[in-house]
Each structure stands twice: as C-alpha cells, then as structure tokens.
C-alpha cells in the first residue's frame, strides 16, 4: 500500500465521522492566514485555531505572490475575512537557495526555465515586511484589512 493509498483510506474514514458540515463557509474568526508549507509547521496549533476559524493558505515560504493575493482577495472580498496574518519561520527551506539556482536546476532537469519565480529569500523577517507591504498596496485587498505577522523557531533535533 502506498502512502497515497493510506491517505485516501484515511480520507474516507474522516468523511464518515465528519461533523462540521454545518459550519458557515466564511471563517468564524474572520481571518486569513498565509503560512509556509513546511511539514513541521502546524498553523492551527501555532495560533490556537480550530476548523472553521480561519482560511489557511500555504505555499513555499508563505510568500505573498500573485496566487497568494488571488486567494487572499477571494477570502476578503467574497468570504468576509478582515484580518491577514503571515506566518514565517526559522530554518525555512526558502533560505537554502536562490531563485537563479532553482531556475537553473529546473532548466537542467526539464529543458526549460520556469516562467515563475520561486521567491527565495535570505531573511524571514524581511520577507514578512515585504509581504505585508505587497498586501497593503494591492488594489484587490480592502485597505481596511489588518495585517500581522507570526514567526516560529524550528529547531533541528541532534
């Protein structure tokens, strides 16, 4: 049995016991979280959230790119969120390469460069500041939106 097979089976069991179907579509706390996709990071646990509380949007690095703005815009303009929190962390994989290195690797393996940027960064703090500025300057995010940031320290085991 593959990991995917196991996950599909887990999904079936979860659906059978799912009891949150009556939760409203808009998140109860009217907040959207943009977080890194790092498997060690649990935004719900980190921020004390439960299902139905928030929209949790994840990507590599938790960067504010066009797709993040798209999701945040839908969350804000159609589903009533009023606050956005960016979650970055130490020991992030996005700190381990440059955009040029990654594009070169993909070109070597796939025969062409991607049309998009990986948005690697050298400082989580600077990327959070940049992300907040991108959100605040976007015409697609209401200017009444409150932005904040959270960070988590990841410690590697010895």
Q: What kind of region is each of these model predictions?
A:
Residues 1-27, 62-67, 74, 78-79, ...:
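Divalent-metal-activated hydrolytic enzyme cores
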Residues 13, 17-70:
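Conserved beta-strand-loop surface patch within small alpha/beta domains used
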Residues 78-89:
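Ordered, amphipathic secondary-structure segments that act as subunit-interaction surfaces
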Residues 46, 50, 59, 91, ...:
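Short glycine/serine/threonine-biased micro-segments
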Residues 37-40, 90-94:
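Gly/Ser/Thr-rich loops at beta-strand to alpha-helix junctions
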Residues 34-36, 58, 87-89, 150-153:
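Short beta-strand segments
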């Amino acid at each position: 049995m593959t990991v995917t097979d196991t996950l599909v089976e887990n999904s079936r069991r979860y659906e059978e016991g799912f009891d949150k179907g009556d939760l409203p579509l808009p998140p109860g706390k009217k907040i959207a979280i943009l977080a890194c996709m790092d498997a060690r990071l649990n935004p719900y646990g980190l921020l004390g959230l439960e299902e139905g509380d928030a929209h949790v949007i994840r990507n590599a690095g938790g960067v504010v790119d066009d797709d993040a703005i798209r999701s945040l815009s839908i969350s804000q303009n159609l589903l009533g969120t009023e606050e956005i929190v960016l979650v970055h962390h130490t020991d992030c994989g996005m700190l381990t390469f440059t955009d040029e290195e990654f594009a070169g690797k993909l070109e070597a393996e796939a025969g062409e460069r991607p049309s998009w940027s990986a948005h690697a960064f050298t400082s989580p703090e600077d990327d959070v500041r940049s992300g907040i500025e991108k959100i605040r300057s976007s015409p697609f995010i209401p200017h009444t939106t409150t932005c904040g940031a959270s960070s988590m320290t990841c410690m590697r085991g010895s």
